[in-house]
């Protein structure tokens, strides 16, 4: 295959990826833009903590991202996110504890969700994703079990950083049953009980209408540009 043909193929694939990204509408998204309180006596504790409404998207009114624990000793902090300034972290995990995103999808179809999640070395490694379309009265399972990778430490694929995005920590899931619903809940529920200090961290929780933008779409476009530059030379 000629260099020209290879460059042309890369450019076509990149253009397709960007076009797919552009066709997706962000209904609601949380990137955790505000630090949680710190210092002696100020760190949030208790059975629940919320970061409030989505800071991005077309349907943020009435939305909420929160964490719920069975132990009042749970603490909530905002360490570095996955390529963003902060993340939503908590410890003292018991089986059944969860993060959850609430929103309305009225007027939107082809719903899907993507999120970044990691843990400490002693944090819960297995979660499930369940969904409710009636405000929490009933739940259905979207992902029966998924593995959460450790951030940093021996054998870990990388450490979360506020300046570098690592797509290996990203997950996504289609949720067609959430189309055009007034009271949708996506719940990330722990399937394990861990040591008190074991933490789980979530970031970049995004609910889309339409295809989920590929994490590598922009990088691929950059590759296409570089290929074009080489061709002109």
Predicted regions and their residues:
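Bacterial N-terminal signal peptides that target proteins for export
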Residues: 1-9, 215
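Bacterial N-terminal signal peptides
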Residues: 10-17
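Extracellular carbohydrate-recognition regions
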Residues: 23-62
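Terminal, low-complexity interaction segments
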Residues: 29-36, 122, 139-211
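Surface-exposed, low-complexity/disordered Ser/Thr/Gly/Pro/Asn-rich loops and linkers
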Residues: 54-106
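Extended extracellular/luminal ectodomain segments enriched in beta-structured repeat modules
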Residues: 105-114, 124, 181
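Conserved Ser/Thr-centered positions that define the repeating blades of beta-propeller domains
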Residues: 130-133
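A short, hydrophobic C-terminal helix/tail in secreted or cell-surface proteins
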Residues: 213-230
């Amino acid at each position: 295959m000629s260099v020209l043909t290879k460059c042309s193929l890369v450019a076509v694939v990149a253009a397709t990826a960007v076009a797919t990204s552009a066709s997706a509408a962000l209904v609601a998204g949380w990137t955790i833009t505000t630090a949680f309180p710190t210092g002696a006596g100020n760190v949030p504790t208790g059975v629940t903590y919320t970061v409030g409404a989505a800071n991005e998207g077309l349907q943020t009114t009435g939305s909420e991202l929160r964490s719920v624990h069975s132990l009042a000793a749970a603490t909530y902090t905002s360490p570095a996110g996955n390529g963003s300034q902060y993340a939503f972290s908590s410890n003292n995990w018991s089986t059944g504890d969860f993060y959850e995103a609430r929103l309305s999808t009225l007027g939107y179809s082809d719903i899907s969700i993507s999120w970044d999640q990691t843990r400490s070395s002693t944090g819960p490694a297995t979660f499930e994703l369940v969904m409710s379309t009636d405000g929490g009265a009933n739940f259905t399972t979207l992902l029966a079990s998924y593995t959460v990778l450790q951030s940093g430490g021996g054998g870990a694929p990388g450490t979360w950083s506020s300046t570098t995005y690592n797509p290996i920590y990203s997950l996504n899931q289609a949720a067609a049953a959430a189309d055009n619903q007034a009271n949708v809940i996506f719940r990330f529920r722990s399937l394990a009980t861990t040591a008190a200090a074991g933490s789980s961290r979530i970031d970049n929780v995004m609910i889309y209408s339409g295809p989920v933008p590929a994490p590598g779409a922009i990088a691929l476009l950059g590759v296409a540009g570089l290929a074009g530059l080489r061709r002109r030379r």
